[in-house]
Amino acid sequence: MNIKSIKDLDLKPGNSVFIRCDFNVPLDEYGNITDDRRIREALPTIRYCLDNDCKIVLGSHLGRPKGFDEKYSLKPVAKRLHTLLKQDIIMAQDVVGEDAKAKFTKLQPGEILLLENLRFEPGETKNDEEFAKKLSQFGEFYVNDAFGVSHRAHASVEAITRFYDQDHKAAGFLLLKEIKYLYKILENPTRPFMAIVGGSKVSGKLGALINLLPKVDKLIIGGAMAFTFLKALGYEVGKSLVEDDLIEEAKNILNQAKNNGVKLYLPVDFVVAPELDPNAPVKYVTFQEIPKTWMGLDIGPASTRLFKEALDEVQTIIWNGPMGVFEIDKFARGSIKLANFVAESFATKIIGGGDTASLISKAGVVDEMTFISTGGGASLELLEGKELPGIKALEVGAS
């Protein structure tokens, strides 16, 4: 994968740079940002352009608006950027309209213009070339620092790159870091290499499991997806979530792991309840004792001990997907315990974005991880071995 870094660009004072960021941050009901990690991760690239005395234009989406909708405005992001960078952020009232153009014309070196939510324009998600061309007029240089949307062929990620030659487009520091940890480690991990795969559905992680199997030495399968595997082994799992149409696939994965000499671990006990409810009664049972009308909602203490032993001597860990319904405290213990055990490991620890990143934050072990991806869907597609359109568009030789 041959991709230009922002450091390879010949940036001169006064040059304009359009940076595609990923400011898709969670907001509470009052429009306050509840987690600004994605904004903070974009700062090194923005600061690099400031140090080079460039005129900076930032573009991002937020949520999935259908046309203009004030609650998806990037104004809270402008406010947070102002706090973090300690400088004024010029906020455009539109994306490629009169206000954005007028403000861009007046932009001075060292100033930052933030465009309004890119998805207010229907052309963004359609990868529309006309819209991409309008966006490209906001920068002599184009930098993609939005790993979280690089798996989508959208106008600000893919089509826009057609308007820049090889010397005028590059990856920002965050995108390069994501590629380094997720892509390069998969290619050449320090062994023993373990993958921890959780979450609710096998269907969502099937591609990743198939791609990881030939690469890993150990594999932990947890979360609700474990029940499809237990059923494939002939066990009854009560009312737990099972994808019956994937039982054959689960059998294939179990056989392939055996043939490849991969040590595969499944939970041996669960926290079960009659329904998914914070007030439901719970009990701990082994995997052979799940009552007919109850469902497993977290892994039990014997499973966390087993997984802790499995972590012994491992040198590289990739984790994607929680072990239970960690959003509800009584079903979060297994995931949090495992997060603590992973934190104590001396291995290189890479966390896929999305739910797993939220879990690591809830467990309070963010600083103990080597790298936490900012993209849930994008990191999963890399684990599946797929090419991401936004990264492919930056490869030297791509037109």
Curated annotation (Swiss-Prot):
Pathway, per record: Carbohydrate degradation; glycolysis; pyruvate from D-glyceraldehyde 3-phosphate: step 2/5
Keywords in alphabetical order: ATP-binding, Cytoplasm, Glycolysis, Kinase, Nucleotide-binding, Transferase
Top-level taxonomic group: Bacteria
A molecular function (GO) term: ADP binding
Localization of this protein: Cytoplasm
EC numbers on record: 2.7.2.3
Coiled-coil segments on the chain, per record: none
Binding site for ATP: 205, 296, 327, 353-356
Location, primary (coarse class): cytoplasm
Reaction catalysed by this enzyme: (2R)-3-phosphoglycerate + ATP = (2R)-3-phospho-glyceroyl phosphate + ADP
Broad EC category: transferase
Binding site for substrate: 22-24, 38, 61-64, 119, 152
GO cellular component: cytosol
Listed InterPro entries: Phosphoglycerate_kinase (IPR001576), Phosphoglycerate_kinase_N (IPR015824), Phosphoglycerate_kinase_sf (IPR036043)
UniProt-listed GO biological process terms: gluconeogenesis; glycolytic process
Pfam families in the cross-refs: PGK
Transmembrane stretches, start-end: none
Disulfide-bonded cysteines: none
PANTHER family: PHOSPHOGLYCERATE KINASE (PTHR11406), PHOSPHOGLYCERATE KINASE 1, CHLOROPLASTIC-RELATED (PTHR11406:SF23)
Subunit and interaction comment: Monomer.
Family named by the database record: Belongs to the phosphoglycerate kinase family.
Name this polypeptide is given: Phosphoglycerate kinase
Lineage: Bacteria, Pseudomonadati, Campylobacterota, Epsilonproteobacteria, Nautiliales
Gene giving rise to this polypeptide: pgk
